[in-house]
């Protein structure tokens, strides 16, 4: 998917060198089916891992210190999945579009390479902040995006739609 490839290439080119300047031991995982050749060629032993298809994405997500969503166009379910798993997330505002997140409370948002790298490094160095953001993100999902909440909202909309009109 082009937006994902663009995000990975931008992160690799613009953000990762800045992160490595502060945290040289950092590893970057690109997980997902059918990565284009340009993404596959980023792989470096011990530092950049391009997996291709994996049976269980959550297995990789559970092991991340920081989940990055460097999208510059598009959107998707990655953020909701990461928050549901209580992962600390750094995203562009585009990657978080349409989701009721608050910068510094349940996510860190950054729209340029320098700020994105600063947020990633901050989370890598601060396990308490990672835990707090992860827990707050999980609460956000439970409160606003769980199946129970979604079905309650849908039921309410149906009830309202079929309610007899009064004059």
Language model regions located:
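Conserved catalytic-core segment of nucleotide-activated headgroup transferases in glycan assembly
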Residues: 1-63
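Short glycine/proline-enriched, acidic/aromatic patches that form the donor-sugar handling elements
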Residues: 37-39, 57-58, 75-76, 95-100
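Acidic donor-binding loop of glycosyltransferase active sites
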Residues: 47, 53, 62-77, 87-88
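Conserved acidic donor-binding segment of nucleotide-sugar-dependent glycosyltransferases
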Residues: 103, 107-114, 122-127
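A short, well-ordered alpha-helix in the C-terminal region of glycosyltransferases
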Residues: 129-143, 150-156, 160
